[in-house]
Amino acid sequence: MLVLANTMHAGERTQTPQLFRKMSRAIRLMAGMQLLPAEFARVLNPPRRTQAPIVFYLGCNALRTPHLLFNAMYVLDALGTDYEVVGGPGSCCGIVQSKWEGELGRGERMINATLTRFEGLSPEKVLSWCPSCNLHIGETLAGFHSTSFEFGHFTTYLADHLDELRLKFVRPLPLKAVLHAHVGLADLGRNVARVLAAIPGLQLVDTVAESGYTCGGSGCARAPELMKKEHAQLIDRVRETGAGVLVTFYHNCHAAFVRAENEGGLRVLNYTDLLVEALGAAPHEDVFKRLRLIDDWKMIVDEAEPYLRANGIEFDRPLLEKILPDVFRMAEFTGGLDCFASRT
């Protein structure tokens, strides 16, 4: 019902015209700044297999912080999961068209195409990463669209396989941590807390649940003053407990907090980083955090340029330096990034 209400409001007067086009280009740019060509192809190209018992559905915006997704794939591999990856704007769940642009027909066509792509792999389960996709597709399947597969969240799959996962944790992590979660979709936050509690040596001293179901434009950023207050309270709580680690949940949450490391006294890690470490491996490099901690847009372009060229992404350097602040803060969700709106 919430999505329907937002759709009706957006249909009357959208403040985010051409959002999907702008978002798609921003996502491709950000993924291209951080990934090697083989990785870039894996998360953006259509699946190569014709059948897979499990589909790991990335959604769109998670590709802005792609190291989380590759960490998640490492965990699936460690569990021996036979899966295929589907993601990127070409497999959008349709929430942007419906909820943000008010284009219900386009949103329906998009979600139907994505569900058809899932069905083409004949999966038993589809595991979603993105909370917005989880909500939108979940609501679509609840009485409106029948499928042959079970749709659920990646963290639920981890919780269901926790006994197996626990046996594979070979590296103790002597850390004190506070988990950042949300009031909305609280069961998913509890899944993460359960899995983290199984890591040897890790002391989860608190879970702080903020308003909304995620950080970012679809979540708590819609109330900026409340978001600012709750984010500050979370950082204070990490310091009060003496925890050295703030554990983030979703991609937007991770993006919102990584710069807190510049203040000193804490590390910002995603829960998937900790899982990979506990499994005895090195997490995928968090290039997003490395770039944000530089906090100099010319230097960020210097760092990103080899990745962009390797991935075949053409760019105008002065323009890129100018727009990167808006790209990183997802300004298209507040009507910005008009340079990405043209059809060419």
Where on the chain are the PLM-derived regions?
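Iron-sulfur-cluster electron-transfer modules
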Residues: M1-N134, T140-L141, R292-P306, G312-T344
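Redox- and metal-dependent alpha/beta enzyme cores, enriched for Fe-S-associated oxidoreductases
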Residues: V86-G88, D163-K168, P174-L226, A310-E314, ...
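A short, acidic, amphipathic alpha-helical segment used as a generic capping/interface helix at domain edges
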Residues: L226-G244, C253
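A polyampholytic, Gly/Pro-enriched intrinsically disordered region
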Residues: L104-N112, K168-L185, R222-Q233, E285-E305
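Short glycine-rich phosphate-binding loop at a beta-alpha junction
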Residues: E124-C130, A177, G244-F249
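Short Gly/Thr/Asp-enriched flexible loops that form oxyanion-binding sites at enzyme active sites
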Residues: H136-A142, A255-G265
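Alpha-helix capping/helix-boundary segments
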Residues: S132-C133, N252-H254
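Short, flexible loop segments at boundaries between secondary-structure elements
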Residues: S146-L173, T207-G217, N262-I300
